[in-house]
């Protein structure tokens, strides 16, 4: 038994040139209950590609559409907050300067008296690094400027005043007093 060759359908045969058969999307229809042939699928794909290729706007639409958009902009209500014509200074020269015809009342600030405890104030003055540096310079024999000398004098006067208030004496004991206390000490106390 020999095999018989299947006969081809006429729709399966592709045209030799494009000009021979122009297909439109409507022309390539699916037959009910049957699959599309390769030729019909190719024709449909070509047409869809041609559609996709021309999907965008026409060339030069940017220029031609501007006249239409200009008409639309006139009808729209503009927000007055957008596009202010008031000039904005690039460099701020005066801070809190009142505008013309306005007066800004100064805020009254009450100076709170900072009454520290005399012991704390004395401790702060003794731990003042600037004062200690200036006193070290004086001990080294250097001459201070007028402002530095005034600062040192004021601080030392305040320290003396606070020591009087607290009852602290700055009297240094003489060598004779030290010898007397040394002689009076009983050595047996420390054993």
From Swiss-Prot:
Residues covered by region (Disordered): 1-84
Biased amino acid composition, Basic and acidic residues: 9-24, 37-48
GO molecular function: GTPase activator activity
Keywords in alphabetical order: GTPase activation, Ribosome biogenesis
Pfam families per record: YihI
Cross-referenced InterPro entries: YihI
Cysteines engaged in disulfide bonds, as pairs: none
Gene Ontology process terms (BP): ribosome biogenesis
Protein origin, superkingdom: Bacteria
Transmembrane segments annotated in the record for this chain: none
Function statement: A GTPase-activating protein (GAP) that modifies Der/EngA GTPase function. May play a role in ribosome biogenesis.
Self-association state and partner proteins as the record states: Interacts with Der.
Similarity-based family: Belongs to the YihI family.
Identification of the protein by name: Der GTPase-activating protein YihI
């Amino acid at each position: 038994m020999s095999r018989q060759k299947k006969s081809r359908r006429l729709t399966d045969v592709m045209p030799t040139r494009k000009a021979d058969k122009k297909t439109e999307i409507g022309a390539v229809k699916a037959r009910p209950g049957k699959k599309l042939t390769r030729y019909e699928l190719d024709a449909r794909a070509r047409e869809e590609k041609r559609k996709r290729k021309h999907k965008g706007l026409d060339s030069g639409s940017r220029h031609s559409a501007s006249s239409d958009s200009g008409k639309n902009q006139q009808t729209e209500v503009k927000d007055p907050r957008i596009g202010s014509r008031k000039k904005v200074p690039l460099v701020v020269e005066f801070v809190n300067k009142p505008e013309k015809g306005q007066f800004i009342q100064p805020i009254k600030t009450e100076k709170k008296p900072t009454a520290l405890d005399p012991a704390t104030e004395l401790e702060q003055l003794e731990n003042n690094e600037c004062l200690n540096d200036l006193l070290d310079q004086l001990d080294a024999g250097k001459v201070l400027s007028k402002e530095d000398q005034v600062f040192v004098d004021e601080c030392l006067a305040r320290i003396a005043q606070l020591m009087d208030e607290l009852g602290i004496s700055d009297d240094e004991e003489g060598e004779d007093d030290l010898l007397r206390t040394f002689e009076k000490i009983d050595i047996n106390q420390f054993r």
